[in-house]
């Protein structure tokens, strides 16, 4: 193989390209050589897409407001010769940065891996088989298969095209899609835009299908040469992260104000003791472990969702999911199984219908009318029946290798039609010797139909096969009667008859396709097929009949929709189906429900539960806004209608999730608050989304919403836990300014290292445990959260619990020093220089540190539920006390951690500025019990006074 990335491939013939690259257009590369080629040419990636930069992650650990305060405190401590405290602060910073770096780096790597899993894929032929691989695995020589909506994975020389058009705007600036060909382009100076036999990496297929040979990959592609990609290369901070960063800098400002207050109270004497007191206040303001805990919790949430088939591409989705009020879902493959089956056929003039048996993709089945079996050959003797089945097989791009083993490829609707043909031994392969494919007019949302043109070798004629929605009837002007084509005598009667049958089938929950065909002589076709416009081909068609396709709802869809309604989430179904088909499926899965106290399913509690796209789009924005409720179902939905639906929801201040899989769904996915792409959907849809569902299942969306709510609820829990502790510490230190020694210097009740020990060592583990708390039973039984992270109740809880802690700790301080002590605050007790003078103060510090640690550990159980008592199961009573093992161990071990700091010599006096205690333990126990009962009293007041849900 020659240098694959350096040849003028557009000037070579297909045979020359395959020879130069050592590949085969039918069988592709051998797997045995792929590894060697990957080593030779490297991964098919742009440099900007390569992983996570560890240096940026490390730098981020030192640039947030919380760490800045600790760095300043460290510098100040060393400046006043308090090396012990400065050393501890430096250790805390390094430890915190290390933990943060490891966890954030892992989180970024996880997100990077998930983005790659949801990144563009490529369908390649290797060793004669068709495989879907990740785009980075493509190598020069790979045979790539393209379909509408695909993002081209590499620069490719085309070898087969069917109506292929590509959007190259991001590469060439050409605003219109470019029609492609396979003929060699002569001329050395052909520009990228003139190389019509080439498709380029990152461009998008907008029409048709084809095959190509990968000739350049990675940075050797045209897009690589200009180092530009449509794929994302980075991940910006989420709104929550931005809010928390803002909070950090607000706290930084508060710490500066508090430092000024300390100096002002002490008449701006900048001696060592006063400076250390200011440092203590600065440290007390900061919940040091907050950012790391949030990062870890969100990373665990991403992994948990990935294990349940939901790949999170952007962290913002985790925050957005908890606020979702409306879900706009596709039907096919999402609410339903996606394994469509043809169950009904109808021919013009029939009073009954043909029923076709067989489940899913089984290629065996029987034909019956009114449950009476009919011989297949007898049916095929009717030219209308035979042509209808022939159209099902040939107006079709699906391939079936072994349906029973799931070896099928193509659109679910087309697979169903192909399976029908196989049941009657008329699959596409049976026509290969007689029918030569010429061109394809693919399905589009505008025409809502698809046609394929074949040349009948035996008859020297051309045949056009068409299938699609009801509007196919508009291009039909003939019927088959007794094997002869006749013009439709009465257009009105014809339309009325067929429309009535469509409605009957639609009410059975069937998707109905209209099937038609046309024969054109070779003489007429000699006008040059390639120049025929679609409008000229799809006319004067002969109507053959109707095909009814059943797409069985997933068993879990009804349960998931019920969960949404319990959670205050409205589900909308946006489908391309007929009005009555959509209505039948919507009732079956529970989207449309009978009015309360009504046994009649046709009576629903709203005036317009189902609208067609035409009806919805005919309304102005003002008329849509005047509707009491938006429709639950939109039938015959188009991508443009999806966008209008999202806009209408936004005008009503709703928070919407939207599903999609096609290239035309990208605008609505981007417009939605949460875009959810299907794993089997187009690459463009995936890149426009925040979440990709690998199982295409509606129940997975509901799981994701539940997980988003769980994560959001847990973040509120541990923020409440951490910040209320900080409030208590600040209260103690602010009021502590009033306690002055003989020199008039304020004596801090809590030393800086004590505060760091509480905030980092004993407070962070239970906060982490709260972050992984299991979802409560009412997670999906309350309306969506719309008040943000810091609602009024959360802020009130932070202040009340902080005030309770701070007040009890101050009482303990006063009791140890004044009630049972010598009432002396000593001299220079903010340092360890005068230990003999500071025994009482140091014992008081030990007492209040242990008491505060035990309070904050007990407070973790308070935070599990905002109002429920600890005596109840809901609030974490006996039945739930040990349900969160991480929390149990955090509390048990945390309660023992202060003991060594109190009793180990030198560590207690030199580092923690405290002393051993004895009888003071009784004060600790009493104050912790008091905190427990005061917390219960506060919750009791909330339960009796506040009747609304948590805000």
From Swiss-Prot:
Cofactors demanded by this protein: Mg(2+)
Top-level class of the enzyme under EC nomenclature: translocase
UniProt binding sites for Mg(2+): 330, 332, 661
Recorded GO CC terms: plasma membrane
Gene3D superfamilies noted in UniProt: Calcium-transporting ATPase, cytoplasmic domain N, Calcium-transporting ATPase, cytoplasmic transduction domain A, Calcium-transporting ATPase, transmembrane domain, HAD superfamily/HAD-like
UniProt KW keywords: ATP-binding, Cell membrane, Ion transport, Magnesium, Membrane, Metal-binding, Nucleotide-binding, Potassium, Potassium transport, Sodium, Sodium transport, Translocase, Transmembrane, Transmembrane helix, Transport
Catalytic function, reaction form: Na(+)(in) + ATP + H2O = Na(+)(out) + ADP + phosphate + H(+); K(+)(in) + ATP + H2O = K(+)(out) + ADP + phosphate + H(+)
PANTHER family assigned: CALCIUM-TRANSPORTING ATPASE
UniProt name for this protein: Sodium/potassium exporting P-type ATPase 1
The organism of origin for this protein: Marchantia polymorpha
Lineage per the UniProt record: Eukaryota, Viridiplantae, Streptophyta, Embryophyta, Marchantiophyta
């Amino acid at each position: 193989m020659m240098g694959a990335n350096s040849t003028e491939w557009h000037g070579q013939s297909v045979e020359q390209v395959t020879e130069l690259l050592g590949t085969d257009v039918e069988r592709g590369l051998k797997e045995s050589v792929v590894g060697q080629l990957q080593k030779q040419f490297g991964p098919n990636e742009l440099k900007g897409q390569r992983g996570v930069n560890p240096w940026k992650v490390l730098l981020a650990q030192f640039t947030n407001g919380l760490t800045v305060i600790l760095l300043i405190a460290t510098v100040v401590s060393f400046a006043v010769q308090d090396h012990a405290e400065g050393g501890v602060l430096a250790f805390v910073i390094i430890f915190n940065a290390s933990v943060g770096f490891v966890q954030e780096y892992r989180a970024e790597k996880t997100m990077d891996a998930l983005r790659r899993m949801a990144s563009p894929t490529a369908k390649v032929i290797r060793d004669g088989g068709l495989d879907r691989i990740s785009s980075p695995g493509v190598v020069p020589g790979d045979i790539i298969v393209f379909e509408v909506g695909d993002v081209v994975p590499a620069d490719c020389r085309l070898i087969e095209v069917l109506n292929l058009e590509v959007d190259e705007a991001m590469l060439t600036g050409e605003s219109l899609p470019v029609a492609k060909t396979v003929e060699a382009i002569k001329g050395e100076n052909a520009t990228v835009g003139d190389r019509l036999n080439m498709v380029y990496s990152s461009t998008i297929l907008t029409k048709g299908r084809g095959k190509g040979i990968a000739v350049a990959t990675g940075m050797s592609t045209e897009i690589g040469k200009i180092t530009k990609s449509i794929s994302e290369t980075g991940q910006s901070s989420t709104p929550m992260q931005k809010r928390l960063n803002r909070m950090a800098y607000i706290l930084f400002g508060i710490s500066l104000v508090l430092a000024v207050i300390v100096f002002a109270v002490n008449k701006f004497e900048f001696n060592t003791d006063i400076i250390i007191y200011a440092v203590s206040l600065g440290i007390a303001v900061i919940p040091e472990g907050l950012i790391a805990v949030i990062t870890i919790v969100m990373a665990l949430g991403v992994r948990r969702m990935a294990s349940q088939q939901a790949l999170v591409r952007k962290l913002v989705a985790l925050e957005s999911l908890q606020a979702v009020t409306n879900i706009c879902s596709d039907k096919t493959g999402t609410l339903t199984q996606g394994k469509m089956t043809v169950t009904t056929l109808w021919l013009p003039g029939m009073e009954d219908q043909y029923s076709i048996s067989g489940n899913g993709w089984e290629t065996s089945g029987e034909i019956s009318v009114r449950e009476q079996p009919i011989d297949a050959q007898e049916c095929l003797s009717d030219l209308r029946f035979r042509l209808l089945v022939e159209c099902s097989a040939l107006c079709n791009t699906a391939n079936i290798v072994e349906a029973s083993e799931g070896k099928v490829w193509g659109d679910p609707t087309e697979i169903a039609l192909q399976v029908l043909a196989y049941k009657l031994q008329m699959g596409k392969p049976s026509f290969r010797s007689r029918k030569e494919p010429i061109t394809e007019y693919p399905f589009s949302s505008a025409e809502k139909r698809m046609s394929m043109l074949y040349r009948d070798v035996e008859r020297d004629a051309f045949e056009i096969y068409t299938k699609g929605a009801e509007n196919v009837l508009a291009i039909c002007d003939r019927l088959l009667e007794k094997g002869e084509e006749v013009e439709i005598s009465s257009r009105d009667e014809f339309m009325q008859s067929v429309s009535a049958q469509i409605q009957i089938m639609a009410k059975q929950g069937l998707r109905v396709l209209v099937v038609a065909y046309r024969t054109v002589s070779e003489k007429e076709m000699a006008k040059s097929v390639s120049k025929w416009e679609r409008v000229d081909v799809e006319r004067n068609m002969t109507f053959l009949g109707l095909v009814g396709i059943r797409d069985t709802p997933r068993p879990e869809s009804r349960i998931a929709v019920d969960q949404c309604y319990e959670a205050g989430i409205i589900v909308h179904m946006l489908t391309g189906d007929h009005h009555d088909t959509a209505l039948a499926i919507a009732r079956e899965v529970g989207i449309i429900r009978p009015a309360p106290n009504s046994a009649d399913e046709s009576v629903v509690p709203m005036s317009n539960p189902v609208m067609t796209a035409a009806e919805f789009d005919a309304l102005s924005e003002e008329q849509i806004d005047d509707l009491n409720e938006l429709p639950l179902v939109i039938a015959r939905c188009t991508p443009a209608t999806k966008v209008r639906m999202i806009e209408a929801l936004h005008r009503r201040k709703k928070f919407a999730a939207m599903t999609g899989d096609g290239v035309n769904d990208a605008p609505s996915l981007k417009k939605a608050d949460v875009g959810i792409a299907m794993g089997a959907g187009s690459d463009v849809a995936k890149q426009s989304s925040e979440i990709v569902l690998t199982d295409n299942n509606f129940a997975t969306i509901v799981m994701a919403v539940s997980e988003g709510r769980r994560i959001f609820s847990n973040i509120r829990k541990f923020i409440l836990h951490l910040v209320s502790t900080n409030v208590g510490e600040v209260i103690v230190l602010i009021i502590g300014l009033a306690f002055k020694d003989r020199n008039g210097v304020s004596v801090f009740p809590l030393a800086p290292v004590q505060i760091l020990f509480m905030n980092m060592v004993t407070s962070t583990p239970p906060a982490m445990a709260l972050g992984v708390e299991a979802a409560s039973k009412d997670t999906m039984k309350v309306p969506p959260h719309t008040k943000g992270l810091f609602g009024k109740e959360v802020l009130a809880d932070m202040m009340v619990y902080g005030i309770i802690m701070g007040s009890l700790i101050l009482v303990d301080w006063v009791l140890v020093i004044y009630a049972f002590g010598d009432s002396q605050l000593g001299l220079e007790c903010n340092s360890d220089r005068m230990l003999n003078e500071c025994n009482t103060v140091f014992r008081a510090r030990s007492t209040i540190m242990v008491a505060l640690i035990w309070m904050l550990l007990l407070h973790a159980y308070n935070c599990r539920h905002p109002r429920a008592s600890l005596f109840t199961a809901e609030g974490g009573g006996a039945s739930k006390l040990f349900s969160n093992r991480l929390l149990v161990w955090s509390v048990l071990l945390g309660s023992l951690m202060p003991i060594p700091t109190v009793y180990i010599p030198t560590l207690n006096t030199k580092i923690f500025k405290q002393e051993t205690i004895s009888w003071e333990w009784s004060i600790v126990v009493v104050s912790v019990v008091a905190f427990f009962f005061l917390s219960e009293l506060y919750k009791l007041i909330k339960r009796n006074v506040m009747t609304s849900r948590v805000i």
